[in-house]
Amino acid sequence: VQQSTSPYFTREAFLTIGRTMKSAGFAAVPYHDTVPSFGEWGFWIATRRSLYNESMITERLERIDNLPKGLRYLTPPLIRASLVFGKHRLATNRTDINTILSGKLHEYYLEGWRHGF
């Protein structure tokens, strides 16, 4: 799991993280939840593409129907809901990834917060 900034305020940064993970050979699926101190916050869950593809990861998460006793927040319906994004929230025309040399992630992060408020 990779915490990945706000998919609302810094959408391009969020999507760049996913593209970068995928370019490194991972199958990656986005999810999000509300974090009290941050608002809507995004994450990517990933595994080696040789083990699972994105559809298989999503299917496994959607099939979770029971969790360990004693959890105070996480529920199976919350897991399923966290995989759903609003219309066009994951759409972009950009295809670039982040590298040490490109700094695209930092650029998109700053751009998002500058225009997000």
Annotate the PLM regions:
Residues V1-S4:
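Conserved beta-strand signature within the Rossmann-like core of class I S-adenosyl-L-methionine
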Residues R11-Y31:
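Conserved Class I S-adenosyl-L-methionine
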Residues P30-F117:
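Soluble small-group transferase modules, centered on the S-adenosyl donor enzyme superfamily
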